[in-house]
């Protein structure tokens, strides 16, 4: 076990404190230092409560966003849920439902899907990954099979991925 904090940290289980929040950030900072020094290939984190993390001049939304800030590239990280035969990644995370449509773009879909494709090839040894892209809107009816976001953002992004040689298919109705 690596020590990220030199001093003793008083932790009251289930109670967020400024002290435990500071220790969580020190642990993430240590992980980022070790990352920059190529000391590991994969980072697995424990939950971090955004309620007790206070960083001057920075609004802490979560550890994934903090890591992206440390790395300096919002499109360089991707949370992946991994099962035996299925991997799931999200274009948006911790985004209120009312803001999701405005949070997706062709660029975010292309960059995050490309990152997933590279990861599937490199880390999971999948020779030719096939990626299903879900629709944002539910299927409406036979005359109107997709919404504005599918027509203007998701389908053009899938076409751009195809131009890059990435097998991305969809959009699949998210409600079926």
Predicted segment positions?
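Anion-binding alpha/beta catalytic cores of soluble intermediary-metabolism enzymes, centered on
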Residues: 1-176
């Amino acid at each position: 076990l690596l020590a990220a904090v030199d001093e003793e940290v008083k932790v009251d289980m289930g109670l967020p404190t400024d002290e435990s929040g500071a220790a969580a950030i020190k642990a993430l900072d240590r992980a980022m230092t070790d990352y920059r020094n190529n000391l590991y290939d994969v980072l697995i984190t424990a939950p971090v409560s955004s309620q007790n993390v206070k960083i001057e001049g920075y609004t802490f939304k979560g550890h994934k966003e903090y890591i992206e800030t440390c790395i300096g590239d919002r499109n360089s990280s991707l949370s992946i849920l991994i099962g035996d035969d299925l991997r799931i990644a999200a274009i948006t995370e911790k985004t209120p439902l009312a803001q999701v449509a405005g949070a997706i773009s062709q660029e975010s879909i292309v960059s995050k899907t490309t990152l997933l494709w590279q990861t599937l090839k490199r880390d999971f040894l999948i020779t030719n990954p096939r990626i299903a892209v879900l629709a944002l809107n539910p299927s409406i009816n036979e005359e109107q099979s997709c919404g504005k976001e599918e027509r203007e953002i998701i389908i053009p992004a899938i076409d751009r991925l195809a131009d890059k040689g990435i097998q991305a298919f969809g959009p699949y109705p998210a409600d079926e």
